Design a protein with these regions (language model features):
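C-terminal region of N-terminal signal peptides and the immediate post-cleavage residues
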Residues: 1-5, 54-67
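Membrane-embedded alpha-helical segments of integral membrane proteins
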Residues: 1-22
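Membrane-helix interface/capping segments
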Residues: 28-31, 61-71
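Individual transmembrane alpha-helix segments
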Residues: 97-130
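Juxtamembrane interface at the cytosolic side of transmembrane helices
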Residues: 19-44, 133-156
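Extracytoplasmic/lumenal ectodomains and periplasmic regions of secretory and membrane proteins
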Residues: 67-99
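Internal/C-terminal transmembrane anchor helices
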Residues: 36-59
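Membrane-interfacial loop-to-transmembrane-helix junctions in polytopic alpha-helical membrane proteins
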Residues: 3-7, 31-41, 116-119
Length: 156
C-alpha cells in the first residue's frame, strides 16, 4: 500500500505546478469573460489542493521511513507511540497507510487499530475543501459556457 507513494509523491507536485501554470497563465485575465475567470479559479483551487496534499504525503513518507528504521529503539514502532498510553504501543503488530483521509494507522494484536499523529489534522480538510471548490468552479464555468452557447444560438 505504501508503494502508491512512488506515484503520488512526484505526481502531486507536478499536478500542482501544472494547474497553477494554467490558472495564472491566462492572458489578459482582467479583460476575460466569466467562463475564463472561473476556469482559472478552478485550476488555482486544484493547485492549492494538490500542494496541500503533497505536504501531507511528505509527512507520511517521513513517518514511514521512521517506522521502517530497524535500529535500537525501533520496537514498538516509533510513530505508534502515544504519549500517556504506552500499553497501546506495546500491542502494535504492524501499520498501514490510508490515502483518503491521509493517515498512518497502527494495527494492534486484538484486531483494533488507531491513527498515529503523523499527518497534521488540517491537511485532509483543507485539501478536500479546495478540491470541492475547484470542482464547483469548473462546473460553474461549464454552465456559463452552455448559457453563452444557448444565447448565441437563440440570437442567430
Amino acid at each position: 500500500m505504501a508503494y502508491a507513494l512512488f506515484l503520488l509523491l512526484p505526481g502531486c507536485p507536478i499536478t500542482a505546478l501544472a494547474l497553477a501554470g494554467y490558472g495564472l497563465g491566462r492572458h489578459r485575465l482582467r479583460q476575460a469573460d466569466r467562463q475564463a475567470r472561473l476556469r482559472s479559479l478552478a485550476a488555482l483551487a486544484g493547485a492549492v489542493a494538490a500542494a496541500v496534499y503533497t505536504v501531507g504525503l511528505l509527512a507520511l513518507t517521513l513517518t514511514i521511513l521512521d517506522a521502517q528504521d530497524n535500529g535500537a529503539d525501533s520496537s514498538p514502532l516509533r510513530p505508534c507511540r502515544v504519549a500517556g498510553h504506552p500499553e497501546r504501543a506495546a500491542n502494535v503488530t504492524g501499520y498501514r497507510v490510508e490515502y483518503v483521509p491521509l493517515r498512518f494507522v497502527c494495527d494492534t494484536t486484538d484486531g483494533d487499530d488507531y491513527s498515529a499523529d503523523a499527518v497534521p489534522g488540517w491537511i485532509t480538510p483543507v485539501a478536500a475543501g479546495f478540491a470541492v471548490a475547484g470542482v464547483g468552479c469548473a462546473c460553474a464555468a461549464a454552465v456559463e459556457g452552455e448559457r453563452r452557447a444557448r444565447r448565441g444560438a437563440a440570437a442567430a
